[in-house]
Amino acid sequence: MATTADFRNGMCLEIEGQYYFIVEFLHVKPGKGPAFVRTKLKNVTTGRILDKTWNSGVKVEEVRIERRPYQYLYQDEMGYNFMHPETFEQITIPGASIDGVQFLKDGDMVEVMVHATSETVLTCELPPHVKLRVTYTEPGLKGDTATNTLKPATVETGAEVRVPLFIQEGELIEVDTRDGSYIGRVKE
């Protein structure tokens, strides 16, 4: 059991039989009345966000999770399929519970979160940055580098990323999987 004072981002809670990750939390101490905690929780199975307010000091059920490395294999109608590199065990995770799934490509290593006691697969976490090749983008105008203008570019996974005008087709770029933003060009 944990109290609201123990809340931190990424913590997993069990509420009414459902598993939730804390996305954001804020301790509020109003001038009048008792303190409380506002949280934004993400449902592990559906991916939906829930806003919940807790009275300060309330006890909640914390879920112990283990992080295990898995390799992405392929996608089918059941979801996304991963394989453990040592045991070759294969698992399927629904796409709704994976953040940044549009940046996932064959062979990528991810961290799969597993319930420590029941061995239930909860979700997976992509690395914060991935290197992807640009497959399509409009050509930039020569000499148009004075402004910080961005243009849409399609990467090898099919996702669309906003990139600077100087990026061309075939270039390797680094993308932040948390918000889908362009980080920089990768030297080959």
UniProtKB/Swiss-Prot annotation:
Keywords: Cytoplasm, Elongation factor, Protein biosynthesis
PROSITE patterns in alphabetical order: EFP
Major location (coarse): cytoplasm
Coiled coil: none
Family assignment from sequence similarity: Belongs to the elongation factor P family.
PANTHER family, sorted: ELONGATION FACTOR P, ELONGATION FACTOR P (EF-P) FAMILY PROTEIN
Protein name: Elongation factor P 2
Underlying gene: efp2
